[in-house]
């Protein structure tokens, strides 16, 4: 378990607000949740409102990796490693992430996380383009993310993350996406060594249209156990 930050308790709340557009479909997402930062677990519920009304026009899974994998304070870090993310508070931090999908779909997201009392406030924007009309995203054929690893690398005074992730598909098969993320703190912090974060998201649909969703995440950081020659 990471060393504690007096501003971050064992149990914390979260609120979310996202504005975005995917293939010309504008939407807003609001959510709330709670979790245990030092254990690397969290659960949240989200409600999507389409600008033109009606059910969600694409798979919610492409948004879930902004909300989950989207506040790295909820990652279990060992006491031997500086926790870049928890050190950032109460000042806050920003994230920038690009998503490149195997069928040409591309998305970008940016968000700010601030701390108000025992609650993280997560405010984001999301833009996605070039998703094929008959592809897994627009046809809503994805069933959630396979567990994956994020490689964390210190670069130019910030932490950068790289993930090759796979969405699972109805009927079997996978759909590949590459994430690239820049994590920026608003104050200087002690940098960790290069390391990996092992993480898993689980999605539960709360309505048939996909507009209401529950997400849970478990994330653990560690240094590779492979011994150098």
Swiss-Prot record:
InterPro entries: GFP, GFP-related, Green_fluorescent_prot. Tentacle tip. Pigment protein that is green in color. Coiled coil: none annotated. There is a cross-link at residues 68-70 (5-imidazolinone (Lys-Gly)). One of its GO terms (biological process) is generation of precursor metabolites and energy. The modification 2,3-didehydrotyrosine is found at residue 69. Belongs to the GFP family. Keywords: Chromophore, Luminescence, Photoprotein. Contains a chromophore consisting of modified amino acid residues. The chromophore is formed by autocatalytic backbone condensation between Xaa-N and Gly-(N+2), and oxidation of Tyr-(N+1) to didehydrotyrosine. Maturation of the chromophore requires nothing other than molecular oxygen. The precise stereochemistry of the tyrosine has not been determined. The keyword 4Fe-4S does not apply. The keyword NADP does not apply. This is GFP-like fluorescent chromoprotein amFP486. Fluorescent proteins have become a useful and ubiquitous tool for making chimeric proteins, where they function as a fluorescent protein tag. Typically they tolerate N- and C-terminal fusion to a broad variety of proteins. They have been expressed in most known cell types and are used as a noninvasive fluorescent marker in living cells and organisms. They enable a wide range of applications where they have functioned as a cell lineage tracer, reporter of gene expression, or as a measure of protein-protein interactions. Pfam families: GFP. Disulfide bonds: none annotated. It comes from the Eukaryota.
